[in-house]
């Protein structure tokens, strides 16, 4: 039921509508006189706003954002005859507020908004439900009020805002809501129609918005237009790949097959996915002994869906004189995909060439990635899968070269098959270099592996319930992995990472002491890298603090220190702590450092505290040994000055940096990870790399056999993949991500540089060979020019890497 007069909403109201006269809409144009409502039956105990009453223009915004164009429209009304039309452009932060009479939301459990996106782009809005005077904090790190984010594809949708759980700081606002604040931080630009903003009581049946036959026809036409565009793009991409396949002598009436490097994303459901894929006469992989290197084979149906698709190396590869390269060293497994639900709160970068003839003529530009299905967890336990007609399915082909393998070229075939379809054979060549990479990363790494679940950023009620239950569920990822504890230790070492906890405290649930069994296991294998004894914090002045130091901290540290010393691994140890603290904390950090150095000599102190001078400036932490700035804050000149004074300067990433710098988010190109710990770490002389978490697992279930997983992408504050570089398969088996694979590849690239530097030193003379070698280890500008200007073209990285391999092999001969 609707009313044209103004009512004050109370907890006992039912079916009361607040019209535009009760809603001050920011920058709304004066609407023409409108007719009475059409009598459509709507869902909701209270319809608050349905835009049916004319109102003078009022300007109001609680946010420092650009205001969109707004007006009352006679299109896409789901209640009555009118809706609110809102239009905004690309990239500019925008926001608008709808005022309502002060309302008690505590008796309702949902708010619904009918939405039609009639623009050219899918887009999203965040809604902040607020009392008058509430401050809007649009940070992704905190929620000072009731907030939710909603994505609108082209066409119609209804946004449901769950009202049951409110942040504690916003509880007082819950009973006196007066403003609905909509905003977009990084919009794509579109036109949306909002209508029938209503409240629903607990248990009340939700009914989606209904539109007139004319509007339904418009909506259907919009959706079909988008579907037709996508279908045309997909058909064009398929036709181009089919033509390319024919040109290399590969033909199939049912199956399209191409290749991509391991450093690229092939988005499985993107209409243009196959445009990223190349038909090949054959595939080649080059690697050193002890190294891993991968490539992707992408399969798509020509028309109808394919069943039981697989890629296999069916026979050993053959080298000179019949020397075999075992097929068991070549894993061909299904790529898994993770769905990002919303537009990320950050931009990622891509390389644009300014001159195609000059490979050093490039720059970087940031863009905000679309939500959707991204390659992420590699399903090492899955060898075959079905492929739907609109999917481009990647298979990860990982080559592991045994350390005893003879150098040379090995040739064989990969077979691509599907049920009822003739197999396609791809010539496959593996070239083994005449040298070996170390078992340990040449670039020291410190990475936290401390599996945890969590509730995530603004979870829905269902997500909240599942994640709470997962805490006590023995089959949930944060628990079941423990069944395979030592398998995880070896798995991480295979990726050149030492099993460790950076945030170890005496009260830690997992590993309050270093896991001595794991560390000695790795030490015996020659794969033990740097590890953390315990977390060190600040120390305040005064007897109370010193008493705690003597009675609690020293005994805890002493036990761990003495154990590491007795096992003969103290030389690998450090104390990590004072994570990202600011200069105001420096006096207490210095006090703590003095105490630790005196009591536990020989163990370096490691911190990400924000000392921009790295221990050699005014108000610096002169008694700290290892500094670790964020890559985006790394200052080369200051780092070199600190190194000259005996400090080590590592670097790290977390949620930042974003835009044009490399990072480890799901949407970042995989090559970002490889470049960051490989070429970039060489170029900027980083002494090591730190990462705060490998195992932030919010998913309540392990990963199954479907490529389209329900593994949670937004692992930390809406940052996709942040702190989550691994996945958990059936029964707790470890699974890598594409990012982790590229991370290892980058560390192996770094090893190539170290090996070549050693060859330069041994060469001992100035000639064409040494000049060419020094150019390679200095990192050519075709790869890296600045932190925010590096090349993401895989061919450039391969060219550099292969040239280094040639130089190393020529030095050996």
What residue ranges belong to the model's regions?
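Short carbohydrate-recognition loop motifs
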Residues: 71-93
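Surface-exposed binding patches on compact interaction domains or structured appendages
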Residues: 226, 230-279, 303-397
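Catalytic domains of carbohydrate-active enzymes that cleave complex glycans
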Residues: 222, 229, 521, 536-542, ...
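Active-site clefts of carbohydrate-active enzymes
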Residues: 644-674
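Extracellular polysaccharide-targeting segments
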Residues: 24-27, 185-222, 422-440
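Aromatic-lined carbohydrate-binding surfaces of glycoside hydrolases
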Residues: 300, 314-317, 338-342, 347-403, ...
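Extracellular carbohydrate-recognition regions
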Residues: 23-66, 206-217
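Extracellular ligand-binding interfaces
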Residues: 88-171, 176, 187-193, 198-203
